[in-house]
Amino acid sequence: AGKPRRPKKKKGCLGVFLTLLLVLFGLSAAALGVTFFVMTDGMKGDVTISDFINTPKELQGDQANILVCGIDYEEGRAYSNDPTSNDGMTDMIMYVHFDLKGHKISMMQIPRNTFVGDSVPNTNGQINSVALAGGSVDALAQVIYDQFKLPVDYYVTIDMQSLKEIVDTFGGVRVYVPHDMAYGGSSLQQGYQTLNGDAAEFFVRNRHGEGYANSDLDRLTMQRYFYSGLLRRFRTMTVWDVAKLLPVFRNYVKTDMSAGTMVSMGVSLLKVDSANIMMCRTPEYGSTQYYNNNSVINAASKETADLLNQYFRTYTEPVNELNLASWYPSSSFYDANISYMGALDNETKDAQQNNNLDGSEDEVPHYETSAGDGASSDSGSDQAA
C-alpha cells in the first residue's frame, strides 16, 4: 500500500466513530472511581438541552436519546472566542436511541448537507450550519426535535481533530477494509489490518475513487467498519487504556451528561449484544440541489417517518407526518442502508480467518504511515462530514 499524505486542512468526517466512544468510556471509567469524576469535570459543556425537547419523564428510565456531533473548527470560519461553546460546523451528526429497557441501540447518521431551510436565521440551508448559526448545539437539537419529531436528552460534541490522537494512543485499531481504497496519494488494501492514526483518518474521511460512486453516502457506509473495530477495542479496554485517554477526552469532548449518567450508560451497554446495535442513515433524495450556492440533499419524508417509527420510537406512538424541509427534491432515492454491528463483526472475523490461516488473533498487514505534504480527501465547498 502507498503512504497517505498529511492533509493540509483538518477537514472532513473525523468524528463519527466517537458515537460509541463516550458511552463505552463510561464502562471502563467506572473502574477508575474518583479519577473518572475528576476527568469529567473537564468535559462538562456549558450548554444544556432544553427540558421541553427531552424524553417524557415517564419514559426516561427506559430510553435515552443522545445527539452526537463532530465539530469542525476549520481555520477561517467565524467562530466565537469562547472555547467552551459548541460553535463550529457540525460536519458529523448522529442521533442515538438507547433502549435501556430492551437492551438495544439504534443510531441514525444524518448527512451534513441535509436541507433544513431557514428555520434558524443565518444558516446556509445545510443541517451542519445550524449549531453555528444558532449559537449552540441546543439549536441543532431543537431543529431535530421540530423537523424529525425526535426527543433529545443529551449531547456529546467532539473536536474532529481528535481521531488520529485517539487511535495512536491505542496503538492502532484493527479494522476490516472491505475494498481497496486509493486517492490523493493515500491508499489502503482490502483486508483485516491495524490502522494507525493517519490511516484511520484516510479510511473515515475518503469519499473519492473506486467504490465511492455516491460520495458522501458511500463514505457513511464505509465508516461503519471502523465503528465495529472501535467497539471491539473498547470492549477490551483496561484501566490503563482509560488513563491514557483522559487527557484526550479533556481536550476534545464536551457533554451535558453527568459522570453518573455516563457510568450508568456504560454499564447498561454491557447488556447490549452487537447483534442489537443497528446503524442507518436518513433516507434521502440523493441528487444534489443548490440553495444559496450551497449543495443540499432532501430527507425523504415518508421513508424517514417509517424508519423512525420502527427503530426510534420504541415506547411512544408512531408519527406519520414529519416537518422536514424540502428544496426541489429529485427523483433519485437512497434508502436507510440499515446494518447491524453483529453482521459487521462476522464479516470482520471471516476476513481475519482468511488472512490468518492459523486462526491467530494477530493482524496481518500493519498499515504504517509517514507524514507528507499532499492533497486532502475533501476539497471545495462540497466537503463532507
Name each model feature, range by range:
Residues 80-83, 125-134, 149-154, 209-218, ...:
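Second-shell loop/turn segments in exported
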Residues 129-189, 256-258:
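Amphipathic, coiled-coil-like alpha-helical scaffolding segments used for oligomerization/assembly
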Residues 2-104, 301:
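Entry/capping segment at the start of metal-dependent catalytic domains
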Residues 90-93, 124, 137-145, 160-164, ...:
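Extracytoplasmic/secreted envelope proteins and their assembly/folding machinery
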Residues 86-90, 121, 130-138, 157-161, ...:
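Soluble non-cytosolic domains of exported or imported proteins
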Residues 114, 120-123, 256-385:
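C-terminal solvent-exposed extensions
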